[in-house]
Amino acid sequence: MENGEKAAETVVVGNYVEMEKDGKALDIKSKLSDMFWHGGSAYDAWFSCASNQVAQVLLTLPYSFSQLGMLSGILFQLFYGILGSWTAYLISILYVEYRTRKEREKVNFRNHVIQWFEVLDGLLGKHWRNVGLAFNCTFLLFGSVIQLIACASNIYYINDNLDKRTWTYIFGACCATTVFIPSFHNYRIWSFLGLLMTTYTAWYLTIASILHGQVEGVKHSGPSKLVLYFTGATNILYTFGGHAVTVEIMHAMWKPQKFKSIYLFATLYVLTLTLPSASAVYWAFGDLLLNHSNAFALLPKNLYRDFAVVLMLIHQFITFGFACTPLYFVWEKLIGMHECRSMCKRAAARLPVVIPIWFLAIIFPFFGPINSTVGSLLVSFTVYIIPALAHIFTFRSSAARENAVEQPPRFLGRWTGAFTINAFIVVWVFIVGFGFGGWASMINFVHQIDTFGLFTKCYQCPPPVMVSPPPISHPHFNHTHGL
């Protein structure tokens, strides 16, 4: 077994070559560039996973707690954190299996980024590829939309002179600059800074809520309605389903086989941010959060809050790049530009991908409810059901299990234990996440459309203050003047 793993490691060490280097082998002349730009270590992968996972959901989790109640909110975070870590592990196993098989066949991945749909194609055939491609691309499309909506929602709490739709136009143009980032190999400094930013924001939410104290007459009535309960649960499912970019992150690593437990450790860190912040904000504001899906809306405006807003804006730009970069790769492959040596040509070719994202963010600016809808309809399949089923079908034969590059952990019961966990995930997520969650999220989403309408200029903005006109002055007549 050890010899097999060493052989696999030798094969999978990889031939990753930077695409922005005009096809030349990676030759880093500048130590500064090496430090900030070229990342491929296990630490880089950990920062990427943790930074990408927590994103803007940090601001909507208190809203989910108001729908679920404190106890259910905490339990669902722990539960979906475990499930998400397991399916990320499955994706990493399938990637290593696929890449090992291909490199044993002397396939060269120079200037080519392996993606999830290609793993499914190589292991299970074109039908799996098509299903995986459809779900993955749709999820990443709406994941990018959510980041754009979050940018507009957050900046409004600093500058409300412009409505949220106008801010969406502005940040759509800003986020389009991510077309110049070649791959996940180049997110080293951004991932590091992104995690620092969300760490500050999480602890700001926690400390500010505790110092603020409970509002007068605070109520914690959740869970009050079944629809709200499953809507909140699917937002948490979405929170820990951020591993749709796992394959791309792994491919950027120098030793992808080291990824196996990285997502688990990233999740453990993320829980130290999400549990205290969501609990503290819900404790302080209670049911008020039901009508304020962004936690910033209820906290007093001061320098600390404004700083947190700015940091989250920068982080959402980074997360937009995380979600959109795999879409850039798919589009490049579709139009035959993926292996182009000119980064400028590839950047120009990527721009059409941003246009539908921009448009959808303007149509559906429902910050909060859209997370649950995407979670139930897309995340449930993309990062939970499909990876679990793919693992079962890839290793369904005894020969495939015997020749597998990576064996399941012994403490989980090897193949029997792994398949049992996979089956449980498929059934649970399909019934609870997609079934009940989809029903609840769609009802809530339609309610937002009925209440605010499509293309709404300023979702959940306070009504404008009506300034009363000055009193009309009447001329004073001296009735005794003519007497």
From Swiss-Prot:
Q: Enumerate the InterPro entries for this protein.
A: AA_transpt_TM
Is Protease tagged as a keyword? no
Q: Topological domains (Extracellular): residue ranges?
A: 72-73, 152-166, 212-226, 283-306, 372-374, 444-483
Q: Which residues are glycosylated?
A: N291, N478
- The question of whether Transferase is a record keyword is answered with no
Pfam families assigned: Aa_trans
Task: Tell me the residue ranges located in the Cytoplasmic compartment per UniProt.
Answer: 1-53, 95-130, 188-190, 248-261, 328-350, 396-422
A GO molecular-function annotation? symporter activity
* Cellular component, GO annotation: plasma membrane
Task: Report the subcellular localization.
Answer: Cell membrane
List GO BP terms, alphabetically.
amino acid transport; auxin-activated signaling pathway; cotyledon vascular tissue pattern formation; response to nematode; root cap development
Which sequence ranges are marked TM in the entry?
54-71, 74-94, 131-151, 167-187, 191-211, 227-247, 262-282, 307-327, 351-371, 375-395, 423-443
Q: Which UniProt keywords apply?
A: Amino-acid transport, Auxin signaling pathway, Cell membrane, Glycoprotein, Membrane, Symport, Transmembrane, Transmembrane helix, Transport
Q: How does it sit in the membrane?
A: Multi-pass membrane protein
Family listed: Belongs to the amino acid/polyamine transporter 2 family. Amino acid/auxin permease (AAAP) (TC 2.A.18.1) subfamily.
Q: Which function does this protein serve?
A: Carrier protein involved in proton-driven auxin influx. Mediates the formation of auxin gradient from developing leaves (site of auxin biosynthesis) to tips by contributing to the loading of auxin in vascular tissues and facilitating acropetal (base to tip) auxin transport within inner tissues of the root apex, and basipetal (tip to base) auxin transport within outer tissues of the root apex.
* Protein name per the record: Auxin transporter-like protein 2
- Which organism does this record belong to? Arabidopsis thaliana
Give the classification, highest ranks.
Eukaryota, Viridiplantae, Streptophyta, Embryophyta, Tracheophyta
